[in-house]
A protein has these predicted regions:
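N-terminal auxiliary segments of SAM/dcSAM-dependent transferases
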Residues: 2-44
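Class I SAM-dependent methyltransferase SAM/SAH-binding core
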Residues: 61, 68, 76-139
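Hydrophobic beta-strand segment of the Class I
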Residues: 81, 150-151
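Helix-to-beta-strand junctions that scaffold the AdoMet/dcAdoMet cofactor pocket
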Residues: 99-100, 159-160, 173-175
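A short glycine-rich, Lys/Arg-flanked "PGG" loop and its adjoining helix->strand segment in the class I
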Residues: 163-178
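Short, glycine-/aromatic-enriched active-site segment of Class I SAM-dependent methyltransferases
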Residues: 188-210, 246
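Short alpha-helix
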Residues: 211-227
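C-terminal lobe and adjacent flexible extensions of AdoMet/dcAdoMet transferase-like proteins
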Residues: 222-282
C-alpha cells in the first residue's frame, strides 16, 4: 500500500471543502460519546442543558467541537476573546455572553460557509459584541497584544503548521493573556506499529481530526517554543475504535485501510484533551 502526505495547501483546501459540506449536516469532529450520533445530546453533554436551551434553535447543530473551551477559559466581564476556527459560532456566542457588553469576541475561520452560518447565528441570538473574520489561524488578521483570552475547539489539530499557529496565538495575546483549548491529542505516540507513523496519519486522513493530532509531548514542546508558560494538558476522554470510526465517517481512507493489529493498537491513543497556557507578563 502506498502512502503520501499531502502538502500544506492541499490539506487546507481539503479542510475547507470538508467543513463546508459538514456545516450543512451538523455533524461534529469529536465528542465524549463519539461523533456519529445526534448533535444536540452531544452538545448538552459538553455544555450543559441550561446553556444549550438558552440558545436559538439551530445554533447547536452547527458545532464541530470536542470540548467546552468557554468553561475552561473562566472568562470575565470586559475581556477581549479570540476563537480560533470559530466554525458556526457556538463558542464565540457563548463567550460573548460571558464577557458582557463591555467585552468583545472575535471569531476567525477560513471557510466562507462557516462564516455565513456564524453571522446568521449571531443575528438570531441577538449578540452584538461578536465579529467573525475570514482568516487562517496561521496568519491571524489581528494586531499584536490585543487579546485577553484565546479559545479554540478541535481546530488546532487541523492546521498543517501548528508551530506557526501557536506563535500567532502568542503574538496576538496581551502580556498575561490566557490560552484555553479543547483538542484531539495523542496520549503516547504512534511508534512501535508494523507501519510508520506517517503511514498511519496518511491513512486516517486530515479532515477526520485525528490524522493531524499532536502527542502530549509535542503539544507541550510547541507551546514552550512559542513562548507560553503555565502549560497544562489534561486528558478528558479516550476515544474508542467506534468513536474514531464515527469521526472518520465520510472522509477518504479510514480504519479499514490499516492492518487490524494497528487498529487495535490505536485504542485509547486518541483523546479529547484540554490545553491551557499563559503568555508571560502582567
Amino acid at each position: 500500500m502506498s502512502y503520501k502526505q499531502a502538502s500544506s495547501e492541499t490539506i487546507k483546501e481539503q479542510v475547507r471543502r470538508h467543513y463546508a459540506e459538514r456545516i450543512q449536516s451538523g455533524s461534529c469532529c469529536g465528542s465524549p460519546s463519539g461523533c456519529g450520533g445526534d448533535a444536540v445530546p452531544t452538545e448538552i453533554a459538553l455544555y450543559g442543558e441550561e446553556v444549550i436551551a438558552a440558545l436559538p434553535s439551530g445554533v447547536v447543530t452547527t458545532s464541530f467541537g470536542c470540548g467546552n473551551p468557554v468553561a475552561l477559559a473562566s472568562l470575565r466581564e470586559g475581556e477581549i476573546v479570540l476563537d480560533l476556527g470559530s466554525g458556526g459560532g457556538l463558542d464565540a456566542l457563548l463567550a460573548a455572553q460571558r464577557v458582557g457588553v463591555g467585552g468583545y469576541v472575535y471569531g476567525v475561520d477560513m471557510t466562507d460557509n462557516m462564516l455565513a452560518v456564524a453571522r446568521r447565528n449571531a443575528e438570531k441570538a441577538g449578540v452584538a459584541n461578536v465579529e467573525f473574520l475570514k482568516g487562517d489561524i496561521e496568519n491571524i488578521p489581528l494586531p499584536a497584544n490585543v487579546i485577553d483570552v484565546i479559545i479554540s475547539n478541535c481546530v488546532i489539530n487541523l492546521t498543517p503548521d501548528k508551530s506557526q499557529a501557536l506563535h500567532e496565538a502568542f503574538r496576538v495575546l496581551k502580556p498575561g493573556g490566557r490560552l484555553a483549548v479543547s483538542d484531539i491529542v495523542i496520549d503516547g505516540d504512534l511508534k512501535g506499529f508494523p507501519v510508520t507513523e506517517e503511514q498511519i496519519r496518511a491513512a486516517l486522513d486530515w479532515t477526520g481530526c485525528i490524522a493531524g493530532a499532536l502527542t502530549i509531548d509535542e503539544y507541550r514542546a510547541l507551546l514552550i517554543e512559542a513562548g507560553f508558560t503555565d502549560i497544562a494538558i489534561t486528558v478528558q476522554h479516550r476515544y474508542t475504535i467506534n468513536d474514531v470510526g464515527a469521526m472518520l465517517a465520510g472522509v477518504p481512507g479510514g480504519l479499514n485501510v490499516l492492518p487490524s493489529e494497528v487498529v487495535q493498537g490505536l485504542v485509547g491513543c486518541f483523546t479529547s484533551s484540554t490545553i491551557t497556557a499563559r503568555k508571560p507578563g502582567e
